[in-house]
Curated annotation (Swiss-Prot):
The protein's Enzyme Commission number: 5.3.1.1
Residue numbers binding substrate: 9-11, 169, 209, 230-231
Function per UniProt: Involved in the gluconeogenesis. Catalyzes stereospecifically the conversion of dihydroxyacetone phosphate (DHAP) to D-glyceraldehyde-3-phosphate (G3P).
Native organism taxonomy: Bacteria, Pseudomonadati, Pseudomonadota, Alphaproteobacteria, Rhodobacterales
Subunit and partners: Homodimer.
Designated name of the protein: Triosephosphate isomerase
Keyword Isomerase belongs to the record: yes
Keywords: Cytoplasm, Gluconeogenesis, Glycolysis, Isomerase
Superkingdom field: Bacteria
Length: 247
């Protein structure tokens, strides 16, 4: 059975004082419950990992450069994330695809780098509002899955997050039928490409304005194994409510 996962993406938010929120979230992370992951900005990764040592809380990065080191000013590599205490890294988030021009090939290279460093990659896919309105959602996501995920995927090194771009930070949420259609499609594509064993073991997260009040309804949808949470993960009261709905 796939273990549920609540992943919090803090994005470019949080100074050292925010470690108090992470400590409060730690109390909701239990070895026999849903897995709980926080992905803080790079400046907080090491202190948050140190604070979480000996607990069930997992720590992750928000991006990694494909190269392990080198003359890449301002970037962070997968080995650096691992060295700082990360066990996961988000790759291909829609904000990086849009703001930084990342393509599927870039996401694929980052995923390989993450695996080589011993990190589990959370590969993000999703359509824009224009693509959904044009009825191209599944075609877009199918292309992203094919282009972004390397051939050596396993249930241990890969998590896929579906994030409808038009729902991120807007308060808009797709219907449960829309979420279910996409998650079932992703599951089928993974099984088709990697076989039933791997395809059924990869966890699928929903990400797009997830809030405590609607979390239970989303988590009841077929093939939704958890959530990639943005703003609601910044406050322990909100994120622990989502974790409780998952557990």
């Amino acid at each position: 059975m796939r273990r549920k996962l609540a992943a919090g993406n803090w994005k470019m938010n949080g100074l050292r004082a925010a470690l108090a929120e992470a400590e409060a979230i730690t109390a909701a992370a239990a070895a026999d419950g849903p897995e709980v992951l926080l992905c803080p900005p790079a400046t907080l990764l090491a202190p948050m990992a140190a604070q979480a040592e000996g607990t069930a809380l997992q720590i992750g990065g928000q991006y990694c450069h494909p190269a392990p080191s080198g003359a890449h000013t301002g970037h962070v590599s997968a080995p650096m994330l691992r060295d700082a205490g990360a066990s996961y890294v988000i790759v291909g988030h829609s904000e990086r695809r849009q703001d930084d021009g990342e393509r599927d090939a870039d996401v694929r290279a980052q995923t390989l780098a993450a695996w080589q460093a011993g990190l589990t990659a959370i590969v993000c896919v999703g359509e824009t509002e224009a693509e959904r309105d044009a009825a191209n959602t599944l075609a877009i996501i199918g292309g992203q899955l094919a282009g972004s995920i390397p051939d050596t995927a396993t249930g241990a090194n890969l998590v896929v997050a579906y994030e409808p771009v038009w729902a991120i930070g807007t308060g808009r949420v797709p219907s449960v039928d829309q979420i279910g259609e996409v998650h079932d499609f992703i599951r089928a594509r993974l099984e088709q490409r990697f076989g039933e064993g791997v395809g059924r073991s990869v966890r699928l997260l929903y990400g797009g304005s997830v809030k405590p009040g609607i979390a239970a309804e989303i988590f009841a949808v077929s093939n939704v194994d958890g959530a990639l949470v943005g703003g609601a993960s910044l406050k322990a009261a909100d994120f622990t409510g989502i974790i409780a709905a998952l557990g």
